[in-house]
Swiss-Prot record:
GO cellular component assignments: cytosol; glycine cleavage complex
Assembly and binders: The glycine cleavage system is composed of four proteins: P, T, L and H.
Organism annotation: Prosthecochloris aestuarii (strain DSM 271 / SK 413)
Protein name: Aminomethyltransferase
Record keyword Cytoplasm present: no
Function: The glycine cleavage system catalyzes the degradation of glycine.
Amino acid sequence: MKKTALYAWHEAAGAKIIDFGGYLMPVQYSGIIAEHTCVRTSAGLFDVSHMGNFMVKGRGAKAFLQHMTSNDVDKLSDGQAQYTLLLYPEGGIVDDLIIYRIDADTWFMVVNASNMEKDYSWLQEHLGSFEGVQLENHTEELSLIALQGPRSMEILDRVFTGGECSGIKPFHFRTVPFNGREVIVAATGYTGERGVEISVPNDAATALWVALMEAGSADGIQPIGLGARDTLRLEMGYPLYGHEINRETSPIEARLKWVTRLDKGNFVGRESCVAVDINPQRTVVGFMMHERAIPRQGFTVYNRDRKPLGSVCSGTMSPTLKQPIGTADVPRGYMKSGTPLYLEVRGKFYKGEVVKLPFVNRA
């Protein structure tokens, strides 16, 4: 089992540690609800160093990424980031990821931990068609720290006191110095709050983590585990691989058409997406329960006549709303807000209804 560069800090802080994506990761510290609330009201610090980190380099790098990903990398300038997908030819999703354009010939990619080896092999498999492109895996060398919450940017400026990070726009990034090392500070995140994700060499990770914790102490900053990371992303309706998206899911039917640029030219999976887009059959919806029955992944979703419609993708008790919420894969005829849905839990049916995403409106 792998450990991140911050593992010793988590252990000393009394974190509950679990195996996630082959890494020993903190799932919670003080408790999921307290940590979730801290991010929504102040700021929290996440170790997400289990995520995969790739570099794509060379004069053919942009053309390679334009072919391999669903979004339009031609729209990016130096210092911009983009949410995108890797697709299979049949239109299913290999992974969702973020691409960062350092310059026209140098690109950084952050992929899901559980898909890292699969993604690397998938990209490697297609390199042969593009001259002068190198793919490098830097996952073992880099840590990824996320600072998220309404107080996050003020805390960041107390560490980077020269204004190096001031005014970073969403989905933009800067390369800045810290302790003699270069770090990438990107205005991205998985919580719906203001914040950044910082890619830092392992040997500087603990120093940066401690500096951010100290800088945020007056604001009540807390370390946040993967448990609260999941409830935060679900309140925003953000997809998680293996839940809302997978190999069988078309982005057209997963509320991800906005990152599937069918008009940009050919890319892997485009033809299949075009075919689905002509007549999509299903979609992912958000729903809220009227009773305190918490939806869980895999629960069957029914209509009012008790006809099975699909299944729950994700579900939890929302710490912000204090109501059970979830996402479900259903026929498109059931996507309108207010449409009733039913779950069967231990032989009893509970009513909910489709609601507009996100569940919680944030920054």
